[in-house]
Amino acid sequence: MNVEVLDISIDYGIDTSVGYFGVDLRAAHMESYEYQARPTDSFVEQAGSYTVPELRGNVSVWWNYDKYSAGATINYVDSFDQMYGVIPEVDSHPTLDLQATYDLTDNSRITVGALNVTDEDPPWSDSEAEGYSYGTAGHSPWGTVLYARATVRF
């Protein structure tokens, strides 16, 4: 296997009288993904095809003030070509996550949030060997997921 990936990470924040605001960008661009099934086989380029979207990443905006923080993240998985399906391309798939945190003490906090707030279905794929109707690499069938977390540091 030969892989070339460009990883990007950019963070920016600003302190204001109403709290600290931040923006984060994380992305990976698959420049090349050559796969060789057996040592005697030729390498096959798979970047942009099944299980290897060329681009995936997320952008987050967040705010902190005193004991409160909140954030939103847009996740993105690029479209990709199917190898064996009737439909030649699986659509791109953005989702939105939200969370809020309250610091109870210096050592404890509670967080609530939701993944895939808009309840986006994964894009349809008809080439899944496992029998699923979505691309399992980078996509989830769960829809909106609510969560709560308590953290205590000792």
Go through each PLM region and give its residues.
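Outer-membrane beta-barrel transmembrane strands
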Residues: 1-15, 50, 55-64, 71-75, ...
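Surface-exposed loop/turn and secondary-structure junction residues enriched for glycine/proline
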Residues: 1-9, 24, 33, 93, ...
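Outer-membrane beta-barrel channels and translocator barrels
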Residues: 3, 15-18, 30, 65-68, ...
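Residue-level detector of the transmembrane beta-barrel scaffold of outer-membrane proteins
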Residues: 9, 20-24, 60, 69-71, ...
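Intrinsically disordered, low-complexity segments enriched in small/polar residues
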Residues: 17-20, 25, 46, 129, ...
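C-terminal beta-barrel architecture of Gram-negative outer-membrane proteins
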Residues: 23-103, 118
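C-terminal beta-signal and adjacent terminal beta-strands/loops
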Residues: 31-34, 76-81, 101-154
